[in-house]
Curated annotation (Swiss-Prot):
It comes from Salmonella paratyphi B (strain ATCC BAA-1250 / SPB7). The gene is yqgE. Belongs to the UPF0301 (AlgH) family. Coiled coil: none annotated. It comes from the Bacteria. SUPFAM superfamilies: VC0467-like. This is UPF0301 protein YqgE. PANTHER family: UNCHARACTERIZED PROTEIN YQGE (PTHR30327), UPF0301 PROTEIN YQGE (PTHR30327:SF1).
Length: 187
């Protein structure tokens, strides 16, 4: 089982404060473990433009039609000071890894320098931090029914409003997660 380019969708009973009601996009999954980015946990009061300001990056030439007020996600509990940019191709940046035909992850500054310009990738999600599972750990969590899995959907990844991503991702599995046991007050 390879879950690269899949969503992990937290089951209602999962109460860990970071992963509760989360959707994790799996960037890498192999015999050594897995790595992913939470795509629906916005950091409070931090948008892309704030990251650019902190790094002293000024988009040149600025395209005012491109919004930089999108929320930055808490990508996971590890390396929360490190940026991960999920985006659609191209992958011409210094530190890019192609996850699928339509998804790339980049960790280098050069992708940030394109944000707000005509050079930026068409779809972008910026996160600080990532989630990781050791060998066999994710598989055990799946056996313990902590997660649902579904092939990733780019509309959910990049376009669905953040507050709706958990429910919409579960619909890929064919269920309304709000009606499942463990979701108090929503049945």
């Amino acid at each position: 089982m390879n879950l690269q380019h899949h969503f992990l969708i937290a089951m209602p009973a999962l109460q860990d404060p970071i992963f509760r009601r989360s959707v994790v996009y799996i960037c890498e999954h192999n015999q050594d473990g897995a790595m992913g980015i939470i795509i629906n946990k916005p950091l409070e009061n931090l948008q892309i433009e704030g990251i650019l300001e902190k790094l002293k990056i000024t988009p040149e030439p600025r395209d005012s039609a491109i919004r930089l007020d999108k929320a930055v996600m808490l990508g996971g509990p590890l390396a929360e000071d490190r940026g991960f940019i999920l985006h659609t191709p191209p992958s011409r940046f210094a530190s890019s890894i192609r996850i699928s035909d339509n998804t790339v992850i980049t960790t280098s500054r050069d992708v940030l320098e394109t944000l707000g310009t005509q050079q930026q990738p068409s779809d972008v999600l910026v996160a600080l931090g990532y989630a990781s599972w050791d060998k066999g750990q994710l598989e055990q969590e799946l056996l313990d029914n902590a997660w649902l899995t579904a092939p990733a959907d780019l509309n959910i990844l990049f376009k669905t409003p953040i507050a709706e991503r958990w429910r919409e991702a579960a619909k890929l599995f064919g269920i309304d997660i709000l009606t499942m046991p463990g979701v108090a007050g929503h049945a």
